[in-house]
Amino acid sequence: MSVEIRETPLGGSLRDFLNVVDYIYRDDPQYVRPLNMDIKETLSPKHPFFEHGEAAIFTAYRNGWCVGRCTAQIDHLHLERHGDEAGFFGFFDTIDDQEVCSELLEAASNWLSARGMKRVRGPYSLNCNGVVGCLVEGFETPPVFLNPHHRPYQGGLIESTGFSKIKDCYGWRYQVGDIPQRVRKALDDVNGMPEVSSRHADLHQVQRDIRVIMDVYNDGWSEHWGFVPLTEAELTALARELRLILIPELTLITEINGEPAAVALALPNINEMIGDLRGKLFPVGLAKLLWRLKIKGPKSGRLIILGIRKSYRNVRKYAALSLYLYAKMNEAGMATGCEWGELGWTLEDNHPVNTGIKMMGGKIYKRYRLYEREL
């Protein structure tokens, strides 16, 4: 029987869109279902992305059963910045069925083409500041917080619809512990500079400190492929969301002569705490999550931001700043009981950052692929 594609308006019922993953990943022990609340907020018309973006939501049905999902979206800030006439697809999950995949991506492509896009790229949920890529390597371990997980067949299905790889992103596994001598020297050198000071984020000033971190991030990452800075509204929403899970010791703001120059931000790996919640925080999921986070504590985390302001990046005196940040975050991980973390993602051609992670002993253990097709 043929595949039926249904479009759901923003703000409409997401029941099938949310629940289809239970069927797709029913026999995958590594899959961790994201929280329904997070996806509903992301796809709500009130989400700050939609101040500069638009999207459509698609679900696929065969014999009346939901068997796949995806979104199509346009980020007008991306278009203004890069001028590449690229629209995105995201939230891509499907059974092992080429027709289902093809019909979903065709629906997304047609929606984007009707709005003037010349190419479609993804998966992005919803843009580069969200969940990025299709997992093509590292299926044997669970995903960490805010990173994707897919079945091994899904990347091949995407390629079979005419998409090709445009970029790989690396997920690095890092074991918290002793650091190499070269990194120890970098830590000691920067610690010995009187103009350099470091502090953690203040939970009583979360809005202020998240803005500081993201300001340095926006500056330091501004020349990277596909980058789009967070807007003021997105910064405000991010600070509000992080306040609930932020561990101050896993944040770092490094100042030079009183000016924020380098930052790092790691989050507890919420996925290790929600695997049995099946996406639901209520009626008892929230209590379980808070106990596991605040009382039991995380055993792993994800370093999502590490950046240096451009004006300091090529100053010889501060060449050790990136290794200093890694070393300080390693110390923070030990102090908070974290045993390991995922660093990244990082772009495959971001050689300076990738080299620094290798120096710390990080190893690539997951690969997230971005695909593109001309329309």
Range-by-range predicted roles:
Residues E80-G162, L277-M360:
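Acyl-donor binding region in acyl/amide transferases
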Residues V21-R62, C70-E80, H200, Q205-I308:
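A conserved beta-strand-loop-helix scaffold within acyl/acetyltransferase catalytic domains
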Residues V3, P148-G226, L250:
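Acyltransferase donor/substrate-recognition loop-hinge adjacent to the catalytic core
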Residues M359-L370:
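A structural motif corresponding to the C-terminal lobe/cap of the Radical SAM core domain
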Residues R121, R173, I253, L265, ...:
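Short beta-strand segments
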Residues M1-K40, S109:
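TRNA-binding/sensing appendages of the translation machinery
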